[in-house]
Amino acid sequence: MKFKASFKCINPECGSSYELTDIIYRCRNCDELLEVAHDMDELKKRSAKEWKELFENRYRKNEWPYGSSVWGKKELVCPNVNNENIVSTYEGGTNLFWADRLGQQLGLEDFWVKQCGMAHTGSFKDLGMTILVSMVKQMMSQGKNIKAVACASTGDTSASLAAYCAVAGIPAIVFLPKNKVSLTQLIQPITHGVLTLSLDTDFDGCMKLVREVCQNDDIYLANSMNSLRIEGQKTISFELVQQFNWEVPDFVIVPGGNLGNVSAIGKGFQMFYDLGSVSYTHLRAHETDSYLVS
């Protein structure tokens, strides 16, 4: 079977689509954001049972590239990348443990914690960055004149981009707000030989600058408005279901942040539901002020 994904405008009245190899971050017709869309009709030609068996056979194995818990779901994530262009540190497969005492304190009978930060650079951003940098390598192999990949960051994104570009041998540029990045996060791009710019502004100022730089198609944008990263992060949902023996938790609570990871996890559960693999769950974003967003 030949699976394929593409960029699609999130505006239902527009619905324009673009190749994943197009250097594009917003719809050319209506200027809305884009998401990665999959050919679900083609994916449904395999039964839920067949998908489960395939993913079980790949999970945490050493066969390249499927030992990565992200690329082990390649057909549902980014089938457009040839295996030889995949840039991976065998991300995913993170620990899920039963937090009994914490659950008792919260009044929850069966409380589990998944440590998505157990990754090469110390954050879940690696799950998305493996997809983005692999796609860049794929585009370069097809003749795209990409000279570097760039991002604005307060730490985690820049560390992840630096690591994956170092693995791929692709130059990277990171824009960081001065004195607002931890030493642990700062040392990673510097150690990986990335052009690291410390700017006397906040994150929004860095983001404005990197967007201006990335107007040139030879510098590729790695920030979250590039929806390729969502595809890697949605595998958190796939992995949770697999770790729970193909059962869905009643509730999944995710740190809010900019809601990118919440969106990714929701997309993953929806995709598994559409394939007939799971039932629905309740997904909630939790902010530090204890405000819940359903």
Indicate residue ranges for each PLM-predicted region.
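PLP-dependent amino-acid enzyme catalytic core
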Residues: 1-283, 290
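Hydrophobic alpha-helical segments, chiefly the membrane-spanning helices
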Residues: 292-294
